[in-house]
Curated annotation (Swiss-Prot):
Name by which UniProt lists this protein: F-actin-capping protein subunit alpha-1
Gene from which the chain derives: capza1
PANTHER family attached to this UniProt entry: F-ACTIN-CAPPING PROTEIN SUBUNIT ALPHA, F-ACTIN-CAPPING PROTEIN SUBUNIT ALPHA-1
Free-text function comment from the UniProt entry: F-actin-capping proteins bind in a Ca(2+)-independent manner to the fast growing ends of actin filaments (barbed end) thereby blocking the exchange of subunits at these ends. Unlike other capping proteins (such as gelsolin and severin), these proteins do not sever actin filaments. May play a role in the formation of epithelial cell junctions. Forms, with CAPZB, the barbed end of the fast growing ends of actin filaments in the dynactin complex and stabilizes dynactin structure.
Any one Gene Ontology BP term: actin cytoskeleton organization
Length: 256
């Protein structure tokens, strides 16, 4: 909404792009913005893990690179990509398992799985994004999570970060911004079995986090928010402001 207003007031996309290009790019990568590429069914997330520079990004599932306009949030100019073929079987197995999980738990969710060599280590990085924007109902919300592990030895450390951001602004302004860091051990065996355990750990961690958030909100509603509510006056009745002039205080105010 704010961006659209600024764009309308400025009425110059070139100037807006020049002045805020870096901010838009960083925002889209931080927020795991979904992108739809013409000719391909599945969306891909815009993340730092797929950033190739010069506004080009990697779509590892479709094995292409593409150009992304951060201002218009439009993808274009897809080209085939054959990088990191050594990790293809691992990436594909984790992607297949994660897609099934996201489809079941996040109706509007998108996931992207990368197979990368980081500091000489073969690494799987998985990103999940799901959002619901309801500006007409005065609320918006987004879920993001990122998980990574290295393929080395019989066990590895699975590291994750979970993020929730919700904004409700009807007759008030309430925001929830929360994140949680997770570390779990994962057994490295065959691709399919590792992918299965990978998703099992993700499902448990994300479920526990969402349950904890819900329980915390219930506790706050029963305690913190209740304490903030305006108490009734000593008469134990609300003032009818439409009849204020019929009250003694209203007449005194009128005669003042």
């Amino acid at each position: 909404e704010v961006f659209n207003d600024v764009r309308l007031l400025l009425n110059n996309d070139n100037l807006l792009r020049e002045g805020a290009a870096h901010a838009f790019a960083q925002y889209n990568m931080d927020q795991f913005t979904p992108a739809k590429i013409e000719g391909y069914d599945d969306q891909v997330l815009i993340t730092e893990h797929g950033d190739l520079g010069n506004s080009r990004f990697l779509d590892p599932r479709n094995r292409i690179t593409f150009k992304f306009d951060h201002l218009r949030k439009e993808a274009s100019d897809p080209h085939p990509d054959d990088s990191d073929v050594a990790l293809k079987s691992w990436r594909d197995a984790c992607d297949l398992a994660l897609r099934a999980y996201v489809k079941e738990h996040y109706p509007n969710g998108v996931c992207t799985v990368y197979g990368k060599t980081i500091d000489g280590q073969q690494t799987i990085v998985s990103c999940i994004e799901s959002h619901q924007f309801q500006p007409k109902n005065f609320w918006n919300g987004r879920w993001r999570s990122e998980w990574k592990f290295t393929i080395s030895g019989s066990t590895a450390q699975l590291v994750g970060v979970l993020k929730i951001q919700v904004h409700y602004y009807e007759d008030g302004n309430v925001q929830l911004v929360s994140h949680k860091d997770v570390q779990e051990s994962i057994t490295i065996s065959g691709e399919a079995q590792t992918a299965k355990e990978f998703v099992k750990i993700i499902e448990q961690a994300e479920s526990d986090y969402q349950t904890a958030i819900s329980e915390n909100y219930q506790t706050m509603s029963d305690t913190t928010f209740k304490a903030l509510r305006r108490q009734l006056p000593v008469t134990r009745t609300k003032i009818d402001w439409n009849k204020i002039l019929s009250y003694k205080i209203g007449k005194e105010m009128q005669n003042a």
